Amino acid sequence: MLAELEGDGRLVLCDMEAGLGTVFRLKPAQLDIVVVVAEPSVKGIDVARRAAAMCASRARVVVIANRIREPADLEAIRAALPEHELIVVPEDPVIARADREGLAPVDL
């Protein structure tokens, strides 16, 4: 399906299942950017580092430093993935509250 959507000026953003199987089934020409989400934990950073290393030869890798609570969280991710562009998403207690209450964050 993605091959049908190829062309200049087109953007397809896929939120795929966890893991790299889907990425590796695509042809390198079908990928421009792979977004890797890194959580600030030992396991989260390790998984992100492995994913970024595996994808770097196939596409540009952008890392989302997700749920950042303090500077040390960001520094740990930055130290593990220094060669990649980094986008920071801070921890937001409204998201957790909305999830607990079964609401959309904008409804709080």
PLM region spans:
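Conserved catalytic-core segment of NTP-binding enzymes
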Residues: 2-91, 97
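Residue-level detector of flexible, active-site-proximal loop/helix-junction positions
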Residues: 92-93, 102
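C-terminal boundary of histidine-terminating zinc-finger modules
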Residues: 99-108
